[in-house]
């Protein structure tokens, strides 16, 4: 979709927002405009919470919308059908970008558009402050794509997150979250996703895309895909996502992609074992041959003090009844075989 079309869609939705707040006298075409933008309206009617963090009713604002990355990925989100309702860039409030209203602060954007989620495309030195602003505005969800945020900044963010219960952070240093066919928040390529029955949670962005492509190829599709990021201090972990997938009726199977470093995979294995879930789980752990003490890509991908090895993680997952594959190329076929064995394939 061209930038002009993205602007048109955004402009229509912006005017529909003004209509919904009593602007029919100023905008006489509001009645017809509302019907054109019904799927992107900003109704104040409460919706049931999303099964796994996002759905078609999620209203998203973009922090850093006027930057190169913010502009490009907002266009992609609008094209995908995500309800992008606003942008936030300090000192640019009162303007429009891609047809969306731009505000000086998250609080102003939330009050005016009823946004309940944010995606952050802000440079690393300022990203933690952007996250804190979203927390202070009490958004339901913040998705931070930014890589390279100083870890001491994220320690402060983690403290703020742990001091409240309203806002959830996904990331940083992640591809984002997508519910295929409904809502895309992040940098993942939308076209490889297909609405389906597999929940995917991963510390690696590119391996997430591999799992998506394979589950699409075998006809299973995805219910929700969450990239939790590879930094040591992130907002959402495997356990948070698994708890959602276990009770989500659309999710019939789960793919977990981990890597060396930390104990997140061991914690996930303990939860899977304790839950007694009957949903098949396939896992892949990256970094089997990584030397101890050397960081492998992500800031959190490091074996230190004899902990966080791929071997330990694989053993924990195997003990929990998880099918662990030795190559990411086998994720899709392994899940399909488990569905066959358990009679879960619909004829």
From Swiss-Prot:
Heterodimer of an alpha and a beta subunit. Its EC number is 6.2.1.5. HAMAP family: Succ_CoA_alpha. It catalyses: succinate + ATP + CoA = succinyl-CoA + ADP + phosphate. It holds the Pfam family CoA_binding. This is Succinate--CoA ligase [ADP-forming] subunit alpha-1, mitochondrial. Belongs to the succinate/malate CoA ligase alpha subunit family. Residues 1-42 form a transit peptide. PANTHER family: SUCCINATE--COA LIGASE [ADP-FORMING] SUBUNIT ALPHA-1, MITOCHONDRIAL, SUCCINYL-COA LIGASE SUBUNIT ALPHA. It is found in: Mitochondrion. The keyword Ligase applies. GO terms for biological process: tricarboxylic acid cycle. SUPFAM superfamilies: NAD(P)-binding Rossmann-fold domains (SSF51735), Succinyl-CoA synthetase domains (SSF52210). PROSITE patterns: SUCCINYL_COA_LIG_1 (PS01216), SUCCINYL_COA_LIG_2 (PS00399). GO terms for molecular function: copper ion binding; metal ion binding; nucleotide binding; succinate-CoA ligase (ADP-forming) activity. It comes from the Eukaryota.
């Amino acid at each position: 979709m061209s930038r002009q079309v993205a602007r048109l869609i955004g402009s229509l939705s912006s005017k529909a927002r003004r209509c919904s707040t009593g602007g029919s006298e100023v905008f006489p075409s509001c009645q017809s405009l509302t019907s054109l933008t019904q799927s992107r309206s900003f109704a104040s009617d409460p919706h049931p919470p999303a099964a796994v963090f996002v759905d078609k009713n999620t209203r998203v604002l973009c922090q850093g919308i006027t930057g190169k990355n913010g502009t490009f990925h907002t266009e992609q989100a609008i094209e995908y059908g995500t309800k992008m309702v606003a942008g936030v860039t300090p000192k640019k409030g009162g303007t429009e970008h891609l047809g969306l209203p731009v505000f000086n602060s998250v609080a102003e954007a939330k009050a005016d558009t009823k946004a309940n989620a944010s995606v952050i495309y802000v440079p690393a030195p300022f990203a933690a402050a952007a996250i804190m602003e979203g927390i202070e505005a009490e958004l339901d969800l913040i998705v931070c794509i930014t890589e390279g945020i100083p870890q001491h900044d994220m320690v402060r963010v983690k403290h703020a997150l742990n001091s409240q219960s309203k806002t959830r952070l996904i990331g940083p240093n992640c591809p984002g979250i997508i519910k295929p066919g409904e809502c895309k928040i992040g940098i993942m390529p939308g076209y490889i996703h297909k609405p389906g029955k597999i929940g995917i949670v991963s510390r690696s962005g590119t391996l997430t895309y591999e799992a998506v492509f394979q589950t699409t190829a075998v006809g299973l599709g995805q219910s929700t895909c969450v990239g939790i990021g590879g930094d040591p201090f992130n907002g959402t972990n495997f356990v948070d996502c698994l708890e959602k997938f276990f009770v989500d009726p659309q999710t019939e199977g789960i793919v977990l992609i981990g890597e060396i470093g930390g104990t997140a995979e061991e914690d996930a294995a303990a939860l899977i074992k304790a839950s007694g879930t009957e949903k098949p789980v396939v896992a892949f752990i990256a970094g089997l041959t990584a030397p101890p003490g050397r960081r492998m890509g992500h800031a959190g991908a490091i074996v230190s003090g004899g902990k966080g090895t791929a071997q330990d993680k694989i053993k924990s997952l195997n003990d929990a009844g998880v099918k662990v594959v030795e190559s990411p190329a086998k994720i899709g076929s392994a899940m399909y075989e488990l569905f066959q064995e358990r009679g879960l394939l619909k004829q």
